[in-house]
Amino acid sequence: MIVVDASALLELLLQTPLGARVEARLFRDEAEFHVPHLVDVEVVQGLRRLVRTGEVSPARAKETIEDLIDLDLHRHSHTDLLRRAWTLRDNISAYDAMYVSLAEALDAPLVTCDGPLATAPGHAARIEVIR
């Protein structure tokens, strides 16, 4: 079981060089991938930003959304994560706190490309940063 955040999924789905390292980590074991429902919105927002800056074409972004929909992800409701996420507010954004809370609840590693998240205090999640 692995929790994957939007930064890692976006790299994976866009098949970037960093995404290749994410893929190697995610698929080295036969693990299930778990995410909060928030991941879909965050990936789409990331794609929007990349399209606006010209880094990704609208057509490629549309394909990536289809790939996201097809990816076998176990999506979790925010309801069970909200209380713990709130306690993390001093050190982690509400968005990141959803992933951290889920990783803690499942006792699973959180795979991310967000380096600062790994050094944020106040949580017990095992965070694996892919660089």
Located regions from the model:
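Alpha-helix capping/helix-boundary segments
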Residues: L9, V39, L81, Y99, ...
